[in-house]
Each structure stands twice: as structure tokens, then as C-alpha cells.
Swiss-Prot record:
E.C. no: 2.4.1.-
One cellular component (GO) term of this entry: endoplasmic reticulum
Gene name in the database record: gpi10
Membrane topology field: Multi-pass membrane protein
Organism: Schizosaccharomyces pombe (strain 972 / ATCC 24843) (Fission yeast)
Highest taxon of source: Eukaryota
Keyword Endoplasmic reticulum: yes
Function: Mannosyltransferase involved in glycosylphosphatidylinositol-anchor biosynthesis. Transfers the third mannose to Man2-GlcN-acyl-PI during GPI precursor assembly.
Pathway, per record: Glycolipid biosynthesis; glycosylphosphatidylinositol-anchor biosynthesis
Name used for this protein in its record: GPI mannosyltransferase 3
GO BP terms, alphabetized: GPI anchor biosynthetic process
Location of this chain's protein in the cell: Endoplasmic reticulum membrane
Keyword line: Endoplasmic reticulum, Glycoprotein, Glycosyltransferase, GPI-anchor biosynthesis, Membrane, Transferase, Transmembrane, Transmembrane helix
An MF annotation (GO) of this entry: alpha-1,2-mannosyltransferase activity
Alphabetical list of InterPro entries matching this protein: GPI_mannosylTrfase
């Protein structure tokens, strides 16, 4: 495809990223932008994961570099530029995800399937709603799509003539690079590659007896040995360089030598502490995550599912299902291979018009869901941020009485005054006996009685209105409503019901 076409997709994803006006999950900010902001500007809120060195520095340092550029150019003083620049960068990563998914399908299934796969990627609910957000999972998915492309290109020349092994070798180096970075950012990304590395070959329709045979695995490693023989030094240098980059990145952010992958494994696997963030049914990834990732393409994905893709999904879903805490975005990196199956289904139609009709109906349904999620669901908690920014700039104090991390923080306030002048309820997992959020909702009067100096502004959800109004009145505190923001038709929890209210002290 011509370069202008890919530039158009880049512009589309930029628009997509800027068009999103809603909140999804706190990690979009507190595991990326907030960390980057703290690193560059030396103020902001660091969650326990960063004070305990449980996460890789690679992802937030990307946005830290962007913030540094804005700082040097003195563009960070513009609230519009400061809050939208990260969106444009993430939109670029989302466009690369579209490109990587297309290239993977092109090598794996051919041009017709690749064209349909790209179309599916462009109307994917997950790509439009999650892919343009600054989650580490989003960048992980982008890297995974490129990794699948390089690995499929490698398979194409596996067992080839000596003259063509140079192509296989260069593809292998590309695969090692992007897969390593994906695993550094999210160590669990290794699950995506277990089955492909052992069993995939260039023919997706290989029978199960041949696919899982010992000879298939033996031939894979025999070719890798033949390919690497005489080139081991180059592979060794690449691997060492990648590890050094990761170690140096962690050293830069944390200020000391740390190994986040060890802490990450201990917290999420051996300790079981991840369950503090909620428990899900063992079948969550099959019964909920898979349908949500595929959307309207789910029946077609299941109809065209081959053994190599099914094995890959199983190797991802099974280990994740053993952990009590589950989230949709954890398995987002498998979306490129699922979208290629949807593209394969549409390419199987003998009539292009019939395939286009099917696609149009599904795309229309996806567009409605995307519009609801990106423009209406959890809208108010983002819409209030410019107001908080302007109040902090005027040295007005405030307190957000809502579940922890309901809003972004300094990545959307960007005010040194707010560091002490504004507060929100925390929920660090090691707070005893309960975290601030629990204490507030368990016994609101007792919690509020400990406030020595009441702030200029209170922000809370409508569900808290009557109890909070009664408390303020009983204490002789006078506040009046100055703003209310619609938040969601379907609240994420009882504590988030109703509009988001802003009250000013009289």
C-alpha cells in the first residue's frame, strides 16, 4: 500500500486518540503518564508499584522523553498541548498496531486476507477504545503485532536454501528485539510466544498430528541451530544490548539498580496479593475477554480458528486463569491474531459485495459501541480535570471524595500547588487496617471528623450527596454546588453512581 494510505491511518488514529474523552482504568495514567510526570517535573503521585520497583521503567520513560521535549520547548505551560501530546504519541503506537497486524496477515495469509484484516483492525472496539490509551498493555500489543510479523516472515524462510537464510536471520533478529521489549514492559508477554516458538509453521492448516509431533519441534531447533551457527556472536550481542538497555532504563528511573521482573512475579503469582484488586471466575477470559476483544467478529473468528492460533490462545488464557485477579487488557496482545482470523473469514467470500455487507453491519454496530465507550461512559471524571487545573493555578484547595484514582492526577493538573493543595482518597494495598477509600465509605463521619482544615472545593459523586450534605450541615460547614458533570449511564460501582458534583465553600 502507498505511503499516503498509511499516513491517512496515522491521522485517523491521532483523531481517534484525541476524540476519546472518557476514563477506562486508572493504570492509563498512574502506571505511565503520572510516573513520567513525576520523573521530569519532580512532583506527582507514585503508587506503591513504583515505590516498590515492581514495574519496568521502559514504558513511562517514553512519555518522560515527550514531557522533557515539551519542557525544553516551554510548551508544557499550554494545558491543551500538555494533555494532548501524549495522546498523539499513543495514537502513533495505535497506527503502528494497525500496520503490524496488516503485515502479519500479509505474510501469514496473503494480500486479500491482509486487506480485510486491516479493515477489521480499524473498526475494532478494543483498538479504538483501549489501543489509543496510554496503557503498557497497549504498547505491548503494538510490539506483539510486529513480533508476529517478524516471526511469520522467519517461518516463511525456515528450512529454506542457504541463500535465503539471510532473510530468516534478519527476521529472527527483528523478532528477538520487539519480543524482548514487549516482555520487558510486560513480563507475561512471554506467554504469547511459547506455542508459536515450539509449534507454529508457515502452513496454518497443518494437521494436529504433524503440528504437535516431536519431529516438528526438533526440526525447529535444528534449523535455529543451523541458522545461528556462525552468527551466535551477533545474536549474543543483540540480547546483551537489549538487557543492558532495560537495566539502564530502570536505573535512570529508580535511581538504583533494581530487577522489577522478580518483584512483578512475586506479587502477581507467588504471593497472590493481586487478588486485592478483585477476583474473577476461572472462565473469565473465555466467557468475557474473548468476546469483548473480538466484538461482532467473534463467530467468524471461531469458524476460522486453526490449531496454531487455538494453541497460542490456550497458552495465554490457561496461566492467566490460574490467577484470581483478571482484567480484559491483560490478554489484549492476542488481538492481532484474532483479527487476522476475522480477515480470513471475510476474504473467503466469493462475492466481495456480500462480504462488504456483512462487514458494514458489524462495523456499524462497533461504531455505536465505540461512540458510547469513548464519549459517554465515565465522561465526567475526565471533564472535571481542566476545572481542577484552573483552580489549582489560582491556589484554590480541593478534596475528591470518591473511590481512589477516580480521576487522573498531575498528568492532567500539572500544578505544583496541587501537590499539597489537592487530595484524593488513596487505596494502597498495604495500608492498615483499611485504606483511605475503605475508611471513608465504611464510616464517613468518623473519617471526615479528622479533617483539620476544610478545602475550598469538594468533588464527589451524586450518590454521596444526601449523607454528605447532612454531615456538612451538622458541622456548620457551608458549601454550594457550582458545577455538575454527567458521568455515566451505567456506573462502574455503587460508589460512582450519579453525576460528579463540584461544591465550593462559602
Amino acid at each position: 500500500m502507498r505511503i499516503w494510505f498509511w499516513l491517512a491511518i496515522l491521522v485517523f488514529r491521532w483523531w481517534n486518540a484525541l476524540w476519546v474523552k472518557t476514563f477506562f482504568q486508572p493504570d492509563e495514567f498512574y502506571q505511565s503518564l503520572e510516573v513520567a510526570h513525576h520523573f521530569i517535573f519532580r512532583y506527582g503521585f507514585l503508587t506503591w508499584e513504583w515505590t516498590s520497583a515492581i514495574r519496568s521503567a521502559l514504558h513511562p520513560l517514553i512519555f518522560a522523553a515527550l514531557y522533557r521535549v515539551l519542557q525544553v520547548l516551554k510548551l508544557d505551560s499550554s494545558y491543551f498541548v500538555f494533555t494532548n501530546a501524549p495522546k498523539l504519541l499513543q495514537g502513533t503506537f495505535a497506527a503502528i498496531l494497525d500496520y503490524g497486524t496488516y503485515k502479519f496477515a500479509l505474510v501469514r495469509y496473503g494480500s486479500k486476507t491482509a486487506n480485510w484484516t486491516l479493515a477489521c483492525s480499524l473498526v475494532s472496539i478494543m483498538n479504538a477504545y483501549v489501543g489509543v490509551r496510554t496503557f503498557s498493555n497497549s504498547l505491548e500489543t503494538t510490539l506483539t503485532s510486529i513480533g508476529f510479523y517478524y516471526f511469520s516472515y522467519y517461518l516463511k524462510y525456515e528450512n529454506s536454501s542457504p541463500e535465503q537464510r539471510k532473510k530468516a536471520y534478519s527476521s529472527l533478529l527483528g523478532f528477538i528485539s520487539v519480543a524482548a521489549f514487549a516482555c520487558f514492559i510486560r513480563p507475561t508477554n512471554i506467554l504469547v510466544w511459547i506455542f508459536p516458538l515450539l509449534f507454529w509453521n508457515k502452513n496454518p492448516q497443518t494437521p494436529i498430528k504433524d503440528l504437535l509431533s516431536f519431529s516438528n519441534v526438533f526440526n525447529r531447533f535444528r534449523f535455529l541451530y543451523a541458522l545461528g551457527y556462525g552468527r551466535l556472536f551477533g545474536i549474543f550481542v543483540l540480547c546483551v544490548s537489549l538487557f543492558l538497555v532495560n537495566i539502564i532504563a530502570d536505573r535512570i528511573l529508580y535511581g538504583r539498580f533494581v530487577f522489577p521482573i522478580i518483584s512483578f512475579f512475586q506479587f502477581n503469582v507467588t504471593s497472590g496479593l493481586s487478588s486485592l484488586y478483585g477476583l474473577n471466575a476461572w472462565h473469565y477470559y473465555l466467557s468475557q475477554a474473548l468476546p469483548l476483544i473480538c466484538g461482532g467478529f467473534l463467530p467468524f473468528v471461531l469458524l476460522t480458528m486453526d490449531l496454531q492460533t487455538a494453541g497460542t490462545i490456550l497458552c495465554v488464557f490457561f496461566p492467566y486463569s490460574l490467577i484470581g485477579h483478571k482484567e480484559l487488557r491483560f490478554v489484549y496482545p492476542i488481538s492481532p491474531i484474532l483479527l487476522t482470523l476475522a480477515g480470513k473469514f471475510f476474504s473467503s467470500f466469493s462475492s466481495w459485495k456480500r462480504a462488504a455487507r456483512f462487514f458494514f453491519l458489524i462495523g456499524l454496530g462497533h461504531a455505536l459501541v465505540i461512540t458510547f465507550l469513548c464519549r459517554f461512559h465515565q465522561f465526567g471524571v475526565m471533564e472535571v480535570m481542566p476545572l481542577i487545573h484552573s483552580l489549582a493555578e489560582k491556589n484554590q484547595t480541593g478534596l475528591i471524595l470518591a473511590p481512589c484514582h477516580t480521576t487522573p492526577w498531575q498528568s492532567h493538573i500539572h500544578s505544583p500547588f496541587a501537590e499539597n493543595g489537592w487530595k484524593f482518597l488513596t487505596c494502597e494495598p498495604f495500608e492498615k487496617p483499611f485504606d483511605e477509600t475503605d475508611r471513608f465509605y465504611e464510616n464517613m463521619p468518623t473519617f471526615l471528623d479528622k479533617i483539620k482544615e476544610w478545602p475550598d472545593y469538594l468533588i464527589f459523586f451524586e450518590e454521596r450527596f444526601y449523607s454528605l450534605y447532612s454531615y456538612l450541615d451538622s458541622r456548620g460547614l457551608k458549601y454550594e454546588e457550582v458545577q455538575r458533570y454527567y458521568n455515566s449511564l451505567i456506573p462502574e460501582s455503587r460508589e460512582r453512581a450519579g453525576a460528579l458534583l463540584v461544591y465550593k465553600k462559602l
